[in-house]
Curated annotation (Swiss-Prot):
Protein name: Polyketide synthase 5
Record key words, sorted: Acyltransferase, Transferase
The encoding gene: PKS5
Tissues where this protein is expressed: Expressed in fruits.
Pathway assigned in UniProt: Secondary metabolite biosynthesis; flavonoid biosynthesis
Gene Ontology BP terms: flavonoid biosynthetic process; polyketide biosynthetic process
Assigned protein family: Belongs to the thiolase-like superfamily. Chalcone/stilbene synthases family.
Alphabetized PANTHER family for the sequence: CHALCONE SYNTHASE 1 (PTHR11877:SF80), HYDROXYMETHYLGLUTARYL-COA SYNTHASE (PTHR11877)
Gene3D superfamilies: 3.40.47.10
Amino acid sequence: MVTVDEVRKAQRAEGPATVLAIGTATPPNCIDQSTYPDYYFRITNSEHKTELKEKFQRMCDKSMIKKRYMYLTEEILKENPSMCEYMAPSLDARQDMVVVEIPKLGKEAATKAIKEWGQPKSKITHLVFCTTSGVDMPGADYQLTKLLGLRPSVKRLMMYQQGCFAGGTVLRLAKDLAENNRGARVLVVCSEIXAVTFRGPSDTHLDSLVGQALFGDGAAAIIVGADPLPKIERPLFELVSAAQTILPDSDGAIDGHLREVGLTFHLLKDVPGLISKNIEKSLNEAFKPLDITDWNSLFWIAHPGGPAILDQVETKLGLKPEKLEATRHILSEYGNMSSACVLFILDEVRRKSATNGLKTTGEGLEWGVLFGFGPGLTVETVVLHSVGVTA
């Protein structure tokens, strides 16, 4: 008779969870950050608020963002004027959009990842879907399963309303799923559309304006599995360890509340200061087993909550400017796409490494770190091991 121990050993993979493919997608509507204040104050009928507009212009100028992509077009907003007011009941209109559009955008990214992976989608055993908005039953995970034509027996996990740290969370979960289920191939999708947070400006709620200056829409998908099939699957990064922690004295630093008016966004404390003050502790805990203490010896993927967070982390850790180059590039080209950001950066790092002819997928380096920051304040830390690039 077979023992439980023997069953468990047979169920577990041999090697570490590995990223096997990455795909990204954005809505077609691209907005220029330099002209966005004019558009935003016009579409929200707020042009008379000249001082507030000047303040918003400064926020956009300091954001280090060149452009963003948004599902919301001028036509859609004109058809839904309640979304353009500051605090008008508008949740129904917002929900009607995102419950359809979030799975659709996720499908675009997932289709690209599956194509790169090169295996039949019937081999996908698990689906992890993450989005900040559009809570529904059955959820976006179910809708995506139908849109992609995945097997009805695919094992699904739906993550709603986690926020900006969740790009790290999905990797942590995918790692556990892949390593504890031999032969598992996990499709991870983060799809974010900021239609739930868009609203007109207010003098009394400047943190909402910060969100209007930073957030963009995008979806990213990755396929994770252990023990890649030689000559069939092409490993990109190994997921070595993953941790989550709540930062001390950070209650209420970032809050989001789903109300009749949509998702309201609140910044209550010095978020960049809290993150930069605590980040070295997370690094030390993650890299002590590897005997790594030189943070410039790593390749970096950090959620770009905003330029101030990146600047303070860079200063606190003494990072060379090129360490956060890929992170800053994604912020500049797409804005803050919440959970999808770090997966876009992961894609950028491996592409840039290949383009520049470097010897590994991680900018020529062996070890890397991926950070997610978000409400809580919650920090996700993922240790990555790059893969050698064969010519």
